């Protein structure tokens, strides 16, 4: 039997309710109360931790990310600091010179919106060829929805002047009618598979690296889509199941498993859905409807304000999308669909309503839910559709959303507080590695709606700023609700999992600008201390 008593603390129980201490026993919260009550209940055999007045919150539960890719990114070329394509070429050449055994160059860290004003352009196959023509080169945009690749990858994909169609994707052509090496959506996803695949041992190493970083920053659950993202599902499954069977993974894991077509949907339900190994389980089916705002591949009903001819990429035909949603509904499987643009959100939530009515008993979810108008938000509430927000996206998006969407639509988007006030179940995640998976940085964005430089001074559309308590609830209780675990996860109450974080500063009373710099001093998962500063 393991027992731990935390005392002399500020324990967040629920909105407006705090305690001084708690007792966990064998992975469950046994009691919450005063320091005296807990110490008298703990007994001689409990580990007793004096928190020195520090704040304790439930463990953060990232409701959508890609944790395998986070680990990969820690080992791969980082061009996030490059301010031109030419700098990326130089960085790529340097990386290969330092890593002569590299069999395929992969990165997903550049952002053209951060390029120097006189050097803003997208890379193409010629730029990638300038890095190497001997091995596959994949330069992915930070959003994960577009990429430049070299001629070798185009050749491996069989793309040329006469063959340049990929269902659910776009292959950009140059003036000569040949693919210029820039790919969107399903086309860039297929190109990733041309990079030599990781082994099971590679995947296990990447998982553990990313999870170590996660628990050091207070994450205790990851709801992650890794299924076929950067490795075949067989590799992903074997790595995960071996880690969790051996008890080596330090956090809980819920698989949001990508299904791009009906065949994959049938295979997922037949082979994996609902299966558990230790602290991991296979959960929702993840679908994709559109792309990203930054790459202008998010589906916009009326096009982009700064590019009216662009309306985004529809990644799945409506008849196939509806058939898959209906299939999952019939099997009792939660569907979580990537939708960023208002066009994607509108189509998808109407399909949810068509198959699930207003009850939505399987809690189908829209991931991202960025560009909306109030009629769409009301529809979401009326049909009990769940939302997974990534407030940390505002670090970048607050600088581009009005130019992409126009002022009026932008002011109805990223509507965190409105969704809360309407009673929509909205959870928080990071979509990492698109953004850092640090929960405190994410909370900062939800509460202040500013970038890390504190701009704009009043916050972007400050009417949608969240209170700290509501933001913490979205990151804990609501994330648990999305996985049907709200009765055992996301609160520090008797009968709940002993997943918690001790913070070095009181996020409920400190200057909101300081939240992003707050750090955990201890993280507990399932009653076990997995990180201690």
In which residue ranges do the predicted regions lie?
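Generic beta-strand/beta-sheet core signal
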Residues: 32, 140, 224-225, 254-258, ...
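An anion/phosphate-binding loop that grips the pyrophosphate of nucleotide cofactors and donors
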Residues: 63, 383, 498
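His/Asp/Glu-enriched, well-ordered alpha-helical/loop segment
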Residues: 326-336, 343-364, 369, 374-378, ...
């Amino acid at each position: 039997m393991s027992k731990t008593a935390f005392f002399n603390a500020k324990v967040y129980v629920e909105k407006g309710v705090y305690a001084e201490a708690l007792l966990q026993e064998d992975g469950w919260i046994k009691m919450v109360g005063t320091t005296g009550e807990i110490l008298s209940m703990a007994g001689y055999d409990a580990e007793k931790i004096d928190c020195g007045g520090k704040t304790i919150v439930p463990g953060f539960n990232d409701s959508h990310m890609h944790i395998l890719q986070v680990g990969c990114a820690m080992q791969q070329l980082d061009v996030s600091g490059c301010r031109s394509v030419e700098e990326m070429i130089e960085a790529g050449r340097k990386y290969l010179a330092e890593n002569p055994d590299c069999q395929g160059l992969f990165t997903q860290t550049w952002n053209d919106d951060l390029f120097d004003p006189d050097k803003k352009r997208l890379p193409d196959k010629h730029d990638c060829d300038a890095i190497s023509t001997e091995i596959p080169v994949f330069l992915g945009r930070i959003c994960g929805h577009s990429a430049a690749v070299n001629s070798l990858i185009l050749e491996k994909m069989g793309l040329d002047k006469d063959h340049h169609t990929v269902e659910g994707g776009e292959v950009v052509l140059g003036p000569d009618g040949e693919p210029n090496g820039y790919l969107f959506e399903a086309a860039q996803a297929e190109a990733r598979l041309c990079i030599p695949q990781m082994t099971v041992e590679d995947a296990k190493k990447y998982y553990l690296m990313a999870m170590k970083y996660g628990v050091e920053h207070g994450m205790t659950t990851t709801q992650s889509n890794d299924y076929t993202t950067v490795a075949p599902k067989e590799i992903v499954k074997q790595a995960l199941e071996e880690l969790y069977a051996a008890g080596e993974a330090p956090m809980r894991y819920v698989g949001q498993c990508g299904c791009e077509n009906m065949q994959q949907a049938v295979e997922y339900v037949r082979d994996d859905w609902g299966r558990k190994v230790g602290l991991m389980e296979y959960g929702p089916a993840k679908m994709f409807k559109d792309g990203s705002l930054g790459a202008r591949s998010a589906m916009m009903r009326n096009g982009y304000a700064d590019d009216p001819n662009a309306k985004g990429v529809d990644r799945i035909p409506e008849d196939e999308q509806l058939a898959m949603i209906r299939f999952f509904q019939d099997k009792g499987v939660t569907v979580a669909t990537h939708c960023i643009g208002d066009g994607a959100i509108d189509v998808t939530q109407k399909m949810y309503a068509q198959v699930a009515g207003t009850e939505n008993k399987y809690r189908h979810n829209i991931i991202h839910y960025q560009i909306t108008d109030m009629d769409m938000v009301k529809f979401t509430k009326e049909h009990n559709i769940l939302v997974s927000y990534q407030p940390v996206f505002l670090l970048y998006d607050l600088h581009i959303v009005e130019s992409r969407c126009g002022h009026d639509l932008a002011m109805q988007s990223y509507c965190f507080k409105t969704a809360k006030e309407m009673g929509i179940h909205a959870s928080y995640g990071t979509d990492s590695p698109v953004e850092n998976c640090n929960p405190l940085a994410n909370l900062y964005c939800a509460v202040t709606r500013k970038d890390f430089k504190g701009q704009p001074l009043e916050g972007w559309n400050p009417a949608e700023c969240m209170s700290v308590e509501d933001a913490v609830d979205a990151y804990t209780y609501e994330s648990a609700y999305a996985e049907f675990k709200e009765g055992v996860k996301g609160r520090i109450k008797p009968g709940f999992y002993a997943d918690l974080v001790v913070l070095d500063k009181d996020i409920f009373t400190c200057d909101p600008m300081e939240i992003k710099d707050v750090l955990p001093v201890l993280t507990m998962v399932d009653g076990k201390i997995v990180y201690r500063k």
